[in-house]
């Protein structure tokens, strides 16, 4: 029981690390900004709930998106015809957490992204070429507080967090495109390194101990991006006249919800935790604050999320593999407007991954 009582502060260590380019996996562009993977795994040395300490976390995330969906319907013909878009995205996430006492903590994190996007339609439609982007992403700074004193509360706890996402990532990353003649221009929104907006992060994390080994967890996350568009040209207006409203990149909100359970095998100086749950993440059609003009691919992914964590003294290893069970590319604002104008339902498509691979390590300094 004591082990789980102290578990609550360790959750704060992991809240902002192990992406997420969280994340909806593919052209629904949730970047690796870290906040989309909240920790549900314990660390053996869990005194961070009650003392001043520092934690360093490093994580890695990879996925390949290639399955196209329009709404919830998969466009299987894209792979048969060989005109699907294929994204390979890797994110290395580094961050540091300062625990002030059993209530308060603050985390600063910065991802590094490596992206490749292979397509036909962006390169004239006859030959497949690739575009690239790599560099630092958007920084986040979040302050968290547990609502109840961990010294007195043993059954469970709730943590609330508030912070900012800073536009440190390049939102106008460029690569060479091959049409009539090669030209350098901005890469697709899904592999841009940042979105150009200053985001407002709000999150709620909680856990409940059912027994000394079995517990449940939940995480709710929303990032509001008040900025409307960021000025990065998409060139979508060159595809069809009906996409004229999408010539500029939108700065969209992002959301995440998780619910699951943990079971811990406790050793003398170590602990192995097995976790399982569901994960919902995506981009809304309309932002919570401000306008929602420009180009975005709204949608969501519902995933089954198995996880493992191994704790040994002052170090914790973790890994999870969210597996998509439902993918939905919802109607964008432009789709809705064109549906009204034409009298027929218009909806774009987006490429999604089958799963993502996430793993990392945390150290108490």
Model-identified regions with their sequence ranges:
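Short loop/turn motifs that connect adjacent beta-strands in outer-membrane beta-barrel proteins
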Residues: 25-28, 44-53, 65-67, 103, ...
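Transmembrane beta-strands of outer-membrane beta-barrel pores
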Residues: 60-66, 110-116, 147, 164-170, ...
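Surface-exposed strand-loop-strand hairpins of Gram-negative outer-membrane beta-barrel proteins
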Residues: 28-30, 62-91, 190
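Residues that define the transmembrane beta-barrel architecture of outer-membrane proteins
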Residues: 52, 88-92, 133-139, 156, ...
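Residues on the lipid-exposed face of transmembrane beta-strands in outer-membrane beta-barrel proteins
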Residues: 45-46, 58-60, 94-98, 108, ...
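Outer membrane beta-barrel transmembrane domains
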Residues: 69-78, 228-365
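Bacterial Sec-dependent N-terminal signal peptides
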Residues: 1-27
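Outer-membrane pore/translocation modules
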Residues: 115-250
């Amino acid at each position: 029981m004591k082990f789980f009582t102290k578990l609550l502060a360790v959750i704060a260590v992991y809240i902002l690390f192990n992406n997420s380019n969280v994340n909806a996996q593919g052209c629904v562009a949730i970047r690796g900004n870290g906040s989309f993977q909240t920790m549900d795994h314990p660390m053996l040395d869990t005194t961070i709930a009650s003392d001043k300490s520092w934690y360093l976390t490093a994580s890695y995330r990879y996925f390949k998106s290639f399955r196209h969906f329009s709404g919830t319907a998969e466009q299987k013909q894209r792979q048969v015809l060989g005109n699907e878009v294929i994204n390979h995205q890797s994110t290395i996430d580094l961050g540091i957490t300062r625990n002030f006492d059993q209530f308060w903590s603050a985390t600063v994190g910065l991802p590094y992204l490596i992206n490749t996007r292979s397509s036909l339609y962006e390169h004239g439609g006859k030959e497949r070429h690739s575009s690239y982007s790599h560099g630092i992403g958007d920084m986040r700074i979040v302050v968290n507080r547990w609502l109840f004193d961990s010294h007195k509360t043993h059954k469970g706890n709730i943590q609330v967090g508030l912070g900012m996402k800073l536009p440190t990532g390049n939102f106008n990353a460029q690569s060479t495109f091959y049409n009539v003649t090669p030209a350098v221009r901005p890469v697709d929104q899904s592999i841009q390194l940042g979105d150009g907006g200053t985001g407002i992060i709000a999150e709620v994390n909680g856990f409940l101990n059912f027994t000394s080994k079995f517990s449940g967890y939940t995480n709710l996350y929303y990032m509001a991006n008040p900025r409307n568009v960021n000025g990065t040209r998409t060139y979508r207006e060159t595809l069809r006249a009906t996409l004229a409203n999408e010539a500029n990149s939108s700065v969209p909100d992002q959301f995440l919800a998780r619910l699951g359970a943990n079971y811990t095998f406790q050793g003398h100086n170590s602990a192995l935790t097995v976790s399982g749950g569901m994960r919902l993440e995506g981009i809304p059609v309309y932002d919570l604050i401000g306008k929602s003009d420009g180009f975005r691919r709204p949608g969501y992914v519902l995933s089954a999320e198995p996880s493992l964590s191994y704790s040994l003294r002052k170090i914790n290893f973790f890994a999870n593999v969210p597996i998509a069970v439902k993918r939905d590319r919802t109607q964008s604002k432009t789709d809705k407007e064109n549906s009204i104008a034409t009298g027929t339902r218009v909806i774009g498509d987006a490429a999604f991954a089958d799963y993502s691979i996430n793993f990392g390590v945390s150290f108490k300094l």
